[in-house]
Amino acid sequence: MLKRCNFKNQVKYFQSDFEQLIRQHPEKIIILDFYATWCGPCKAIAPLYKELATTHKGIIFCKVDVDEAEDLCSKYDVKMMPTFIFTKNGDAIEALEGCVEDELRQKVLEHVSAQ
């Protein structure tokens, strides 16, 4: 399942699929956080991801439950959790694997400043 973090510290479920989100925002960076509810490192980095989502409104932050979105996991070759895929128009432009807080923060800042 694909969830989009809104900017009021909540997560809402999308009824639409990822391709529709891309069509709606072709020029925006979309960050996909591939996580699992049972994953300890995913839980550890979740507060930072939420903070980034509320701070950087020029980027769309989504959470993808790997147990419910095998097609997206396959498309982006996700092998571990958490994995963060930075996309533009559906194409992966950057990927981070693991609970890499400093790297995640740095990559988000790079993409925000490039817009």
Swiss-Prot record:
Biological process (GO), any one: determination of adult lifespan
InterPro entries: Thioredoxin, Thioredoxin-like_sf, Thioredoxin_CS, Thioredoxin_domain
Domain Thioredoxin per the UniProt entry, residue ranges: 2-114
Active site residues per record: 39 (nucleophile), 42 (nucleophile)
Site (Contributes to redox potential value): 40-41
Cystine residue pairs: 39-42
Lineage top rank: taxon: Eukaryota
This protein's name: Thioredoxin-1
